[in-house]
Regions:
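Bacterial Sec-dependent N-terminal signal peptides
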Residues: 1-28
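Acidic, contiguous N-terminal accessory segments
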Residues: 18-143
Length: 143
């Protein structure tokens, strides 16, 4: 009796695993965010877009990495500032309390790219996601 129950147990275990739903990453973002919703519109990057940082000095350093990267890969020189101006498309790093250390929220509209986090780790991961969402043309050396 024991010899028959062991194989039946393993078959049952395998069948339980077969019922799990596969998660498909439609956006080619790694790691796949917990939630993601596609919106209409595009944000157009140019040298007039300021980078606004409302966070610690360490986050300012992370934001300056964005400036350096965009200058290197796209020839765009974005200027850091502490002030957000209305009706000026901007990239904003905004610190809020209460999020997990590596958590972030990335929001992109035609007027604003905003990375919100509580810790530098979250800002770093949000920026890595933003890099993955940039069009491939940005990474071309020909301009």
């Amino acid at each position: 009796m024991k010899k028959k129950s062991l194989p039946v147990f393993f078959v049952g275990l395998l069948m339980c695993g077969c019922q799990m739903k596969e998660v498909i990453n439609e956006y080619n973002v790694v790691p796949l965010p917990v939630t993601m919703s596609e919106q209409q519109g595009r944000f157009y990057l140019n040298s007039d877009v300021p980078i606004v940082v409302n966070a610690s000095q360490e986050v300012k350093h992370i934001a300056s990495g964005l400036s350096t990267t965009l200058l290197d890969i796209a020839g765009l020189k974005l200027k850091p500032t502490d002030e957000l101006h209305e009706n000026v498309p901007s990239i904003v790093f905004d610190s809020i309390p209460g999020m997990e250390k590596e958590a972030y929220k990335l929001s992109v509209t035609p007027q604003l790219i905003k990375i919100t986090a509580s810790a530098p780790n979250g800002f770093y991961y949000g920026l890595q996601t933003l890099y993955q969402l940039l069009p491939v043309d940005v990474y071309c050396k020909e301009r």
